[in-house]
């Protein structure tokens, strides 16, 4: 990504985050969650990615992308939403979400805002599947 950006002069915006539990739960965090609270570890990982870069690349994300399950935000997913909201509050990184079939958008926004994320830095995605106009 860095090489392509440097060679082309294009500004490439990298995302960090996690997909919903049903398809995007990394085995490491699922196993760790079974052993105890992972909230601090997820927060520190997100914070480090934003301030120092992802892994050893030096590439910092310009946005977080998060997802929740259909009709619910699981406890596991909530850890990632809360960590991202906290890092966003501290560093200003925007958050884009993914909804399953247009469900949980308002709940995602409420959760992120309740954790201190700036509503002007949140975009709820994939709401086209929702028939609820309220």
Task: Describe these PLM feature segments.
Residues 1, 84, 108:
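Aromatic/hydrophobic pocket-lining residues that form π-stacking "cages" and hydrophobic walls in ligand
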Residues 1, 45-48, 78, 104, ...:
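Detector for methionine-enriched segments
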Residues 3-5, 28-29, 109-114:
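Short low-complexity, flexible loop/linker segments enriched in glycine and/or proline
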Residues 6-94:
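Active-site gating/metal-coordination segments in enzymes
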Residues 90-134:
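Active-site core of metal-dependent hydrolases
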